[in-house]
Amino acid sequence: MSVLQELTKKKYSSLKTMFDDKYCPTFVYSILDQTIPGAVYADDQTFPKSFFIGTESGIYFIAGDQGNRDFHDFIAGYYEEQVKSSKRFTLFSSSDTWDSVLKPILKDDLNQMRRAAFSYQPKSFKKTLQLPKGLVLKRIDEDIISHSTAFNSAYYEEYWNSVSQFASKGFGFAVLHGNHVVSECTSIFLGHNRAEMDIYTLEEYRGLGLAYCVANRFIAFCMENGIVPSWDCDICNNSSIALAAKLGFKTVTEYTIYYSG
């Protein structure tokens, strides 16, 4: 594997503004804010131009100068090591130019998916709809996590490193029917005053507007606390795109992810 340099954590904060004028997934800011564990590799410690940033759970982002051949070798080698150890490898590309570079490097080993990134339009915020009788909305805590089927302890261990880390730094809301968690909207990632939303509703409770209600509460919390809500999804996920539009999000860009499995 070609040797690139892992940047020291004291350099993380200075990198955040480098991604402000282009697409950058929220998990990158989570790493740079040191909200979750991760690593930043670059072609130079002092004046980095190419970046490979990843979570411990196997989600990565590549950005910067596409012409560095050593960087190409590093990506190929890193991917091969992940495959050998049967670890997750999900790579977010920052541009179409990077796509053209990555395809020959990764060959045909990985699946590809086009995704859309959305921007929230604050003026379009609407009041919460009334929940159906018998349902209540609460902020997610460790007790709710212990009763959840979708956003359970394994979920937070994967994306937040631990339930306690999420409880300390993250937030989310759930609709409950008794002790039954039926719909949730949580911050899968949080960084640089951005919170990426992840939503799930049990199949038997869909069609009741619960996802809209719980997402609306999530957005309201963001507005109250100076946080920008973030929404990304597969471009073929029509129900997610429709819900995003209803909540006040507009598509700003599309990008490609490469993933194993």
UniProtKB/Swiss-Prot annotation:
Could you tell me which residue ranges the N-acetyltransferase domain spans?
Answer: 135-261
Coding gene? Answer: ydfB
- Reading the lineage from the top rank, the first entry is Bacteria
What are the EC numbers?
2.3.1.-
Cysteines joined through disulfide linkages: none
Specify the protein name: Uncharacterized N-acetyltransferase YdfB
Q: Where is the signal peptide?
A: none
| Similarity field | Belongs to the acetyltransferase family.
Keyword terms of this UniProt record: Acyltransferase, Transferase
Gene Ontology MF terms in the entry: acyltransferase activity, transferring groups other than amino-acyl groups
